[in-house]
Amino acid sequence: MSRIELTNVTKRWGQFYAVDNLSMVIEDNAFVTLLGPSGCGKTTTLRMIAGLETPTSGRITIDGVPVFDSQRGINVSANKRKVGFLFQNYALWPNMTVYQNISFGLSNIKEEMPKISFEAKNAARLAQILKNPQDVVKTLEECRDKNGKLDETKAIIKLIDTYTISQYTAQKLFGYHLEQGKDVSAEVKALEEKVEAARKAQPFNENFELLKDGEVETAVRKLTKEEIDLSVRRVSRIVKISMFMDRYPAELSGGQQQRVAIARTLAPEPSVLFMDEPLSNLDAKLRLEMRYELQRLHVETGSTFVYVTHDQMEAMTLATQICLMNNGVLQQYAAPLEVYNHPANLFAADFVGNPSINFVEAKGWQGPEGSIELTLLDGHKAVFTPEQPLQLPQWFHRRDEELEAQAQALKARAGESGYVEKSNKDETFRYHIARVNDEDDGIHEEPMLTNEDLVLGIRPEVLSITGGGNVECEIYGAMPTGMESTVKVCIGEYLLTGVVFGSTLFTIGSKHLLDITGSSVMLFDRSSGRRITSGTLKLL
């Protein structure tokens, strides 16, 4: 379908930068979620790609075609970008049936498209179906009520779905009354003759597109009733709402209304489908069901999906790529598990994961064998072993070079014509350290930091309190959910959150020995917030 590329895209209002110098590529057939806290710029980014918001500067291309370029003065209107938009509010017409809601946009399409011999196409399809009357009879027999009477409405819907035809063709097919055992060989012959007569009048190809001098003839035209109906039936089958075509939105549940909105968006066959928190109005159970539906929809349509959400669970379960933003700046663009297991910085580690990651401040220095000796949690000793060979002095040297390059790039940008200083300044993420006597982290001034100041990121699932460890902890709180329990443990004044799988019950105040398992403990640079590496942590 479509590949989307954003190059140095910026959107600002005055000095406030909603999106700041964003560059990213959304590959064809990708499912990308724009994730981040409220006000981070994700909806603004979506609206700029769709053409509903004009960027301040930058370049956007869809399928290699520029739709916005500030330097060349290009700004293609939203209705010409061939994209679909699904909103949080379903925006269904209350006075229209489901069928009318889906077909409304199709009836307004007027563009250049091939001329088609619809009479020949429908006649050929009918002849093909009538050559096997026993199959039609079998389909019709399934539509009898308990009294043995044939239900015409049900029969027509069944014929539409079985043979992928429009309601108009289905009505003609039903009119032959094959259930009465009629011989339709003469009708088949007449239909085939009709097709040949149309071909002689003006030749057409296998798709019944009219030919002129061997080329497909085109014209600026609207869609016919037949084409509209086929599109409506196609998308209704995809989202499974064929049985609701004659109902009004008020007669549908929230999930059914959402399916109608999705069908309406898919009907014009957009090259890209944009979704702005479409599931936020649904209850938790229905939201989970619709996630599965969106996954299936992405596979069946083969379209490029761009999905905005602040719910990291939705992003993790739906996306092939996550675009994580904060304060208008791209923090990380990677696959969901990559963001979870190898977050780029403290913000990414904190935002993705439920329960949230544990942050532990530490002082550390690297020994000659490569491991890092740490002092943490008010004097406890630990050893961190990197998953790959690491030389901390070299890492800090590269960090300083990159930060200097960023500063020079920002300085050069500030010297450009039209540059406006950013009021919402970018700052290193202020992580939260959970304590028994919790207090606002903002009231403490940040101390002078050195390269020995580090932060450990410990996911709840790697905390173990069921085996042998070296550090005593106390159960501060426990929330069993059946298959697992979320616990808070206290070490001195510090609190750590863990997830223990199984049906073990924990008593508040009970003592346990804490251990850290696995090799996914993260080591961050405290001054820049960047992740240095991952590895194992041994508490001594």
Annotate the PLM regions.
Residues 304, 309-422:
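Internal alpha/beta loop-helix hairpins
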Residues 67-84, 108-115, 127, 138-149, ...:
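ABC ATPase NBD coupling module
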Residues 35-37:
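The feature captures the beta-strand-to-loop junction immediately N-terminal to the Walker
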